[in-house]
Amino acid sequence: MYEHYHSGWIECVTGSMFSGKSEELIRRVRRGLFAKQKVIVFKPSIDDRYSELEVVSHNGNKVEAVNVHHSSEILEHVKEAHDIIAIDEVQFFDNDIVGVATQLAEEGYRVIVAGLDMDFRGVPFEPVPELMAVSEHVTKLQAVCSVCGAPSSRTQRLIDGVPAKFDDPIILVGAKESYEPRCREHHVVPK
């Protein structure tokens, strides 16, 4: 997977909530740090669930991160020599994140992005599908369905324990109190 490239590349880690996306991003970042590579990690300002200045996985692993409001701010922070640029919760960025990641890869960086591939309705969650298309490596992770234990590819949003409706707002930052991993069979989105 980590062949030597003369230019940079993009790695996209995706899947449903609770599938281990942030955990995998943190693992790859730590491997880079162990190899004495220079790493910088970014997260969107909207993601304030666990920490404003860290990427934190659901099981508590964390790595220091720069909090940004707009994808263009990433380019402003990447001024010194870095080897790895990691971006978590990429689905919360504007669609310009695709161009930012592409530009960084073309400048020779290893770019790792992690985010949801589908929203709570089971609809592709832009800009992640486009990032998947331009990535050299795509890792799609699955969680375990909270109803039956089957592999989970969907994220179920719950409002007071009841499935959210299709026309509810797409973005609602939350964790276990609002979302569950579900398989295709047990994913419910009332119209």
Swiss-Prot record:
ATP binds at G15, S16, M17, F18, S19, G20, K21, S22, D88, E89, V90, Q91. The keyword Zinc applies. GO terms for molecular function: ATP binding; thymidine kinase activity; zinc ion binding. Its main location: cytoplasm. SUPFAM superfamilies: Glucocorticoid receptor-like (DNA-binding domain), P-loop containing nucleoside triphosphate hydrolases. GO terms for cellular component: cytosol. It is found in: Cytoplasm. It catalyses: thymidine + ATP = dTMP + ADP + H(+). Zn(2+) binds at C145, C148, C183, H186. GO terms for biological process: DNA biosynthetic process; thymidine metabolic process. HAMAP family: Thymidine_kinase (MF_00124). Homotetramer. Belongs to the thymidine kinase family. This is Thymidine kinase. It comes from Macrococcus caseolyticus (strain JCSC5402) (Macrococcoides caseolyticum). The gene is tdk.
